[in-house]
Swiss-Prot record:
It comes from Influenza A virus (strain A/Turkey/Ireland/1378/1983 H5N8). The record marks 202-203, 206 as: Important for efficient shutoff activity. Signal peptide: none annotated. The lineage of its organism: Viruses, Riboviria, Orthornavirae, Negarnaviricota, Polyploviricotina. The keyword Chaperone does not apply. Plays a major role in the shutoff of the host protein expression by cleaving mRNAs probably via an endonuclease activity. This host shutoff allows the virus to escape from the host antiviral response. Hijacks host RNA splicing machinery to selectively target host RNAs containing introns for destruction. This may explain the preferential degradation of RNAs that have undergone co- or post-transcriptional processing. GO terms for biological process: viral RNA genome replication; viral translational frameshifting. Its main location: host cell. Belongs to the influenza viruses PA-X family. Keywords: Decay of host mRNAs by virus, Eukaryotic host gene expression shutoff by virus, Host cytoplasm, Host gene expression shutoff by virus, Host mRNA suppression by virus, Host nucleus, Host-virus interaction. This is Protein PA-X. It comes from the Viruses.
Length: 252
């Protein structure tokens, strides 16, 4: 699974996931399913914000190619992917500027158009079950929840899906692609089932053979949303754009 993650996700997403796990004392080489889940969640958050801007009239607009007009403002502030100190600094700044209620838990995004924090969920289970778990944890009507599954299902607070259908379809297609790629390599069952994951881990620890059948190339294209995480360690030039193929795994 670790090899799959490193070769099928953008290197910057992988690095952010590694930093997040190490911040909590977790090892990506051991907790490989969690490593994959974090990378998937990060990519979903970045794709959620990609191409979406607010014009000078305060209207939402989509710009998919080239540099956006200087008058346009990014619609979403990305909180997920930052270290906790920086993330809370961003949240506090937003709350002080907009007057919105400070959330109890760190959200994933802030929507400047709807003036609300957003919690993104990606689940391997039923969307309604995961939605209820998120809602019970957050316990705040101020934070908007949007759940995606690997089967193309989604669920959002008050059935308000925030994004246009095409933007959401990009995310759903990417998640379905990840599922297919995992399944083709015999990784999906262990990703879904903790019991199977433990069995696979024991098997992997016993084997010293290198993984075979994995893709040999990795996409180095950068999601525009990743660029907004500067000045952490990325440059501020938002030029690369995820297209319809957005970071598909390369097959041999």
């Amino acid at each position: 699974m670790e090899d799959f993650v490193r070769q099928c996700f953008n290197p910057m997403i992988v690095e952010l996931a590694e930093k997040a796990m190490k911040e909590y004392g977790e090892d990506p080489k051991i907790e490989t399913n969690k490593f994959a889940a974090i990378c998937t969640h990060l990519e979903a958050c970045f794709m959620y914000s990609d191409f979406h801007f607010i014009d000078e009239r305060g209207e939402s607009t989509i710009v998919e190619s080239g540099d956006p007009n200087a008058l346009l403002k990014h619609r979403f502030e990305i909180i997920e992917g930052r270290d906790r100190t920086m993330a809370w600094t961003v949240v506090n700044s937003i709350c002080n500027t907009t007057g919105v209620e400070k959330p109890k838990f760190l959200p994933d995004l802030y929507d400047y158009k709807e003036n609300r924090f957003i919690e993104i969920g990606v689940t391997r289970r039923e969307v309604h079950i995961y939605y209820l778990e998120k809602a019970n944890k957050i316990k705040s009507e101020k934070t908007h929840i949007h759940i995606f599954s690997f089967t193309g299902e989604e669920m959002a607070t008050k059935a308000d899906y925030t994004l246009d259908e095409e933007s959401r379809a990009r995310i759903k297609t990417r998640l379905f692609t990840i599922r297919q790629e995992m399944a083709s390599r015999g990784l999906w069952d262990s990703f879904v089932s903790p019991r199977e994951a433990k069995r696979q881990l024991k098997k992997d620890l016993k084997s010293q053979e290198p993984c075979v059948g994995l893709p040999t190339k990795v996409s180095h294209r950068t999601s525009p949303a990743l660029k907004t995480l500067e000045p952490m360690w990325m440059d501020s030039n938002r030029t690369a754009a995820l297209r319809a193929s957005f970071l598909k795994c390369q097959k041999k």
